[in-house]
Amino acid sequence: MPAVTYEHIKTCKQSGARLGIVHTPHGSFETPMFMPVGTKATVKTMSPEELRQIEAKIILGNTYHLWLQPGNDIIKQVGGLHNFMNWDGPILTDSGGFQVFSLSNLRKITEESVEFRHHTNGLKLFLSPEKSMEIQNDLGSDIMMAFDECPPMPSEYKYVKDSIERTTRWAERCLNAHKRPEDQALFGIIQGGEYKDLREQSAKELVALDFPGYAIGGLSVGEPKPVMYEMVEHTVQYMPDDKPRYLMGVGSPDALIECSIRGMDMFDCVLPTRIARNGTCMTSNGRLVIKNAKYANDFKPLDENCDCYTCKNYSRAYIRHLIKAEETFGIRLTTIHNLHFLLKLMEDIRQAIREDRLLDFKDEFFEQYGLNVENPKNF
């Protein structure tokens, strides 16, 4: 029995989206689900108690950052990430691959590993499939990700083909090096850039290795959204129905709806927390930039349709003042709101699937959010 399993509840008759439950050693969560990102063992400015209050069910930790600071050996001493950060729900850790490929300019890819320089002190480091598994086994996450290569978009066909074949070989090495399959589930990551045949090849090769779950990687890296939707739609048909499907790095409201419609179950992104730090808020009427002068004496909540802690207690004028004054409390309030907004959106998506009306919900949401106009204010 794998450490993580997927239970299918129903398929939306109108859209084909799926409602399910993912069961993990630290509890279960309904899908489709958005997962807040806690890069360095904290969702920035939020306590675990606050995450529970906004109904976050599963959070992410970042293997690359936790390996470099404080070190996986320290986290292992206390029994893993759950104890270290006092979060008793499910945790997913990424493999570190994306950071190596995005943060480090100086890198050398060989069959054995990736050689790169530390993004702050320039020290030479190596990350391999085996090392990634060792770190993630020490972190003790419920879901671990295979170490993959993330080719930039766009890349030449030949380069991407070589890359996905290496990713498959690395995936096999990850499976062999993974020491705790009974209480940690290792997911494979499908790559292939914007080439449909390579996405298909990558999916088929990884499905043959029989991981307990699968992710689509290498999207939401700057390509136009229609390209991303096309790649998801094409790839999902090669992913097993009886295992979780995770779309990495997606967190804009429109993409969460569109990719739920296309059959994905799990999503993560730093977007809601990152934009909160400069005062950009997601609301039911679209994007709101709280620093704008027009909010200086606006005493309404960020979103009159929202019942989060921020919207129930504080005004736009007050939050604008805090953000302009660079007060940490302002960032806490916008972070709470943005994460609550996305988690509530996912709840609404799940309810619409239950009622077989996700396409209707999409139309209503897009209309109110202001996405049906030319050049909408989006993320």
Swiss-Prot record:
Protein name: Queuine tRNA-ribosyltransferase
Gene behind the chain: tgt
Organism: Staphylococcus haemolyticus (strain JCSC1435)
Keyword Zinc: yes
Binding positions for substrate per the UniProt entry: 94-98, 148, 191, 218
SUPFAM superfamilies: tRNA-guanine transglycosylase
GO biological process terms on file: queuosine biosynthetic process; tRNA wobble guanine modification; tRNA-guanine transglycosylation
Cross-referenced HAMAP family: Q_tRNA_Tgt
Reported cofactor(s): Zn(2+)
Positions of Zn(2+) binding: 306, 308, 311, 337
